[in-house]
A protein has these predicted regions:
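Alpha-helical transmembrane segments in multi-pass integral membrane proteins
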Residues: 2-20, 34-70, 87-93, 97-98, ...
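Hydrophobic alpha-helical transmembrane bundles that constitute the permease/transmembrane domains
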Residues: 23-26, 69, 172, 176, ...
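Hydrophobic alpha-helical membrane-insertion segments
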Residues: 24-38, 108-128, 297-305
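Membrane-interface helix-loop-helix regions
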Residues: 50-69, 107-170, 176, 265-278
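Hydrophobic alpha-helical segments with transmembrane-like composition
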Residues: 77, 84-90, 107, 147-206, ...
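Interfacial transmembrane-helix starts/ends
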Residues: 96, 100-108
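Extracellular/periplasmic envelope-modification machinery, especially enzymes
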Residues: 359-392
Length: 392
């Protein structure tokens, strides 16, 4: 859920809630769940999917778009994040002072919990199979990098522990750039955001090995889109035109499930424009339910790999082993468990932990005599990252 102050601002759109964007985050998280289903097709001790993994995924013909293109949901998370941050932080003069407290309170507790859970599950898996499941190395160095959310900043030897959290790691760097540039963004607005987006996109093309660059490109692309709407809110009717043209071009020129930027960019931008179009038409707030549904996306995203690992540990003990994952019933159990964990986690862990961190920060500030800002802003976290469809 996106929470903003009620203060009027020339840097804030007149629409308070973007319910379709919130709802779309849950759909994006589900797409990532499908994308990573190939992990079930990996034989014990071999962290590479067979070349025919598509034929081993249940109901692949029905859900082919999600199985084959689900990785684009991570880029979608990034572009939505940039838009949401602009909506929440640009128009609030006090936001910069409490930015990092709000971000840490929202993101770090669940990241820490799932990190510890995966470490325990991987230890059990290694004891049985002899090597880690999908993601390695899982050593002390990479655990410490994960603790500081620095596990995909270039110091790593590969994806480790709760591997999908790599996108969270690089998005933290995008947050740092946003926080640093916030005063300039408020002054020059569109030009700065567009320059950062273009810089990230160009760097992603020429240095494709670093996940930060596409993250910056999409994140500040979302911020630039916000500035465009600030200047032309009465022209928002162009959004459905943009979405339609973009989707048509994507079908024609970007049909393959490639994982390297800029492949998939047409899909990401077009679906983002489509979600904004729905929000523009939703003037009566009929999609308000989407806020609560979107809140489950972060938990579903971070819990889905430990749930996968748990299911694999069980399947390996059953007659039939991992071949059972080819049945739609295992797919249903996996999806239900991950989505259910997302809702349960948000209600019973993420929100209480967030309140506890914010309260602790407030006590610390009072003890140091630091003036208290207004009620902290809360922005729903978006994380999503894919691994490749054939991880080593």
């Amino acid at each position: 859920m996106v929470v903003v102050s009620d203060l009027p601002s020339a840097l804030r759109l007149p629409k308070r809630h973007f319910n379709a964007l919130d709802l779309s985050r849950l759909f994006a998280a589900v797409a990532v769940l499908f994308w990573h289903y190939l992990h079930f097709t990996m034989p014990p001790g071999i962290n590479r999917a067979p070349t025919n993994f598509g034929t081993l995924e249940p109901l692949h013909g029905v859900f082919a778009a999600l199985y084959d293109h689900g990785h684009l949901a991570v880029q979608y998370f990034w572009i939505v994040s940039g838009f949401v941050f602009a909506h929440v932080y640009l128009g609030d003069p006090a936001a910069r002072e409490r930015f990092w407290t709000a971000r840490i309170a929202r993101l770090w507790p669940l990241h820490l919990l799932t990190l510890v859970v995966v470490a325990a599950l991987q230890a059990l898996y290694v004891a049985r199979v002899g090597r880690s499941f999908v993601f390695a190395p899982n050593d002390v160095t990479h655990f410490l990098l994960n603790l500081g959310l620095a596990h995909y900043w270039g110091f790593q030897s590969g994806m480790s522990f709760n591997g999908p959290s790599w996108s969270l790691s690089v998005e933290i760097l995008a947050y740092a750039v946003f926080w640093t540039m916030l005063p300039m963004l408020r002054e020059r607005r569109l030009g700065i955001a567009a320059a950062l987006a273009c810089g990230g996109a160009i760097a992603a093309i020429y240095a494709p090995g670093l996940g930060l660059w596409p993250c910056l490109g999409y994140f500040f692309g979302g911020t630039a889109a916000y500035f465009v709407l600030l200047r032309a809110w009465n022209w928002v009717w162009l959004l459905p035109v943009t979405a339609a043209i973009g989707l048509a071009l994507a079908v024609r020129f970007d049909p393959e499930p490639q994982t390297i930027f800029p492949y998939g960019a047409l899909w990401v931008v077009s679906l983002f424009a489509l979600a904004l179009t729905i929000d523009w038409f939703d003037r009566a707030d009929r999609l308000a339910f989407g806020r609560k549904l979107g809140d489950a996306s972060y938990g579903a995203y971070l819990w889905h790999f430990p749930i996968q690992l748990t299911i694999v540990l069980v399947l390996d003990r059953l007659p039939g082993g991992r071949e059972l994952s080819q049945h739609w019933g295992i797919l249903a159990i996996y999806l239900a468990a991950a989505i259910g964990a997302g809702f349960a986690s948000h209600r019973w862990f993420e929100r209480p932990a967030q309140r506890a961190v914010l309260a602790a920060a407030a006590r610390l500030e009072r003890g140091q005599g630091v003036p208290q800002p207004a009620t902290p802003l809360s922005v729903s976290a978006i994380q999503p990252p894919p691994t490749t469809r054939s991880p080593a």
